[in-house]
Amino acid sequence: MKTKAVRIYGVNDLRLEEFDLPPLKDDEILARVVSDSICMSSHKLAMQGDAHKRVRAPLAQNPAIIGHEFCGEIIEVGSKWANKFKPGMRFAIQPALNYKGTLWAPGYSYPYIGGDATYIIIPNEVMEMDCLFEYKADAFFMGSLSEPVSCIVGAYHAQYHTQPGSYVHEMGIKPGGSLALLASVGPMGLGAIDYAIHGGIKSARIVVTDIDQARLDRAQKLISVESAQKEGIELI
């Protein structure tokens, strides 16, 4: 089967190409990509090329399909995974595989899987690491956004507090506390504000900063002080 994809060959060397996918192996899955959101990490990949830690260098000989926030539909399933996945099933993906201690990830490290493609082959390690998920919602773009949203949620869960005289980490933000979000009016920052307002743990006060007043003004239009007040939160 032919696919059309954007592959990286080196620093700022991105090429939209059409090429043949290899025959499907018994432990692989053929899929169609429907949506892929763009991450600044892909920009970093383009700027660094072979120096990026997730790349299997050299890219000039091993070009990788870019894009790691994607969602789509399964077309064909190898026999190994036929009991778990079916043709027609919608999927989302967790690209941070952590496979055998490596940093390999779809969108950085593989020749036949990435979000900026029409058709892809999902390799065995994605399923082995339980990083391929059935997606049951209607809008594919929401499946693409599951990866960046997981980064936002993970950042909140990684915060911790300690008590005087104790080294025990109390994980997560503090209910009824004060929360500062620095430089947080870009796409991920807006998501962080939204999660702070509507997530399970609510701060009493959220202070948002940025160096660009125009971006702050736009953020205030998208997420108003009044909407936060309805949730019992002072948004500054």
Locations of regions flagged by a protein language model:
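Adenosine-nucleotide cofactor-binding segment
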Residues: G176, L182, I193-I236
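Glycine-rich Rossmann-fold phosphate-binding loop(s) that bind the pyrophosphate
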Residues: V77, P148, A183-P187
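Hydrophobic/small residue at the entry helix of a nucleotide-binding pocket
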Residues: P187-M188, R215
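NAD(P)H dinucleotide-binding glycine-rich loop of Rossmann-like/cofactor-binding domains
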Residues: L97-G176
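Residues that mark the start of a beta-strand
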Residues: K4, E28-L30, G177-L179
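Short Gly/aromatic-enriched secondary-structure transition segments
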Residues: K44-H52
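Glycine-rich beta-strand-centered segment in the early N-terminal region that forms part
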Residues: P22-S37, A51-K100, I113-G114, F133
